[in-house]
From Swiss-Prot:
Family affiliation: Belongs to the cytochrome f family.
Name of the protein in question: Cytochrome f
GO molecular function: electron transfer activity; heme binding; iron ion binding
Chain's gene name: petA
Transmembrane segments annotated in the record for this chain: 277-297
Length: 310
């Protein structure tokens, strides 16, 4: 019942966002949540890349190792040129928005707010975190957020405690991260958004270029067989062809309006055992003590040799 209610409320929110703010609604991770049980495919690709075709760099910073039941930060960096604007769903210029996903190992999850430090509270101000599904609290989503203020998104993470969960073990784990800026080029239905380049589906002569009822443009191509092919271009992309021009199949009809992109990467973190840390400290202390004793022994031998005139 709870799952149905969540889906219903999510549908209402998304529906309203599409009506009220179509330029930003396409960035919501709702699409991935409803279409994919797991956001990471067998190939390792995050499903975000199925709609966000352009590639851009994403970076992440995590500690090399953490202790059990401790809070740490995963900082996802989504760089792009300041002031960059993209084409919204209505064809107008809008600021870029950003989003991120962090796929943690089983047992790791978003830290409860009562364990956030003051620094974390300050760094996450205005950021809303959601888990991918009720069953996957180790997958955390953020976005869309205004890009100019959120080029770095801090995720407060709680590490598991093997003493409380026998399925968790100390050792090295992989973390998968994805970061996006801007709208996608393809909708989950397979249709192109207006944030994409449009190409011709037929060869022939462009006979007419006319505005259509949706604010976009209809390009009519007369083929050699006499057939009239109408290419519907949505509002937003700029045309790069003109009437009377002869074109081939696959020729760009518009410029590429996209200025954003998606990037993903993997990193590693070690869930450190306290016993191992103590063992390492003891080992290094033993090595240091051995070195000191060797130096002292060497000096003692040198003194004896000097006294004996050797």
């Amino acid at each position: 019942m709870r799952r149905i209610l969540t889906f219903f409320l999510g549908s209402i929110i998304i529906g309203l966002s599409i009506i009220i703010s179509p330029s930003s609604s396409f960035a919501y991770p709702f699409w991935a949540q409803q279409n994919y049980e797991n956001p990471r495919e067998a190939t390792g690709k995050l499903v975000c890349a199925n709609c966000h075709l352009a590639k851009m760099t994403t970076q992440v910073e995590v500690p090399q190792s953490v202790g059990a039941d401790s809070v740490f930060k995963a900082a996802v960096k989504i760089p792009y040129k300041p002031g960059t604007e993209e084409i919204g769903a209505d064809g107008s210029k809008v600021p870029l928005q950003v989003g991120a996903v962090v796929m943690l190992p089983d047992g790791f999850k978003l830290a409860p707010q009562d364990r956030w430090t003051e620094d974390i509270k300050e760094e996450t101000k205005g950021v809303y975190f959601t888990q991918y599904s009720e069953e996957k609290d180790n997958i955390i989503l953020v976005g869309p957020l205004p890009g100019d203020q959120n080029k770095e998104i801090v995720f407060p993470i709680l590490s598991p405690d093997p003493a409380k969960d026998k399925n968790i073990h100390f050792g090295k784990y992989s973390i998968n991260v994805g970061g996006n800026r801007g709208r996608g080029q393809v909708y989950p239905t397979g249709e192109k958004s207006n944030n994409s380049i449009f190409t011709s589906t037929a060869a022939g002569l462009i006979s007419t270029i006319e505005p259509n009822k949706d604010g976009g443009t209809n390009i009519t191509i007369q083929t050699e067989s006499g057939e009239a092919i109408i290419e519907e271009i949505p509002v937003g992309p700029s045309l790069v062809v003109k009437e009377g021009q002869t074109i081939d199949i696959g020729i760009p009809l518009t410029s590429d309006p996209n200025v954003g992109g998606f990037g993903q990467l993997d990193t590693e973190i070690v869930l450190q055992s306290p016993a191992r840390v103590i063992g390492l400290i003891a080992f290094f202390a033993g090595v240091a003590l051995t070195q000191i004793l060797l130096v002292l022994k060497k000096k003692q031998v040198e003194k004896v040799q000097a006294a004996e005139g050797i």
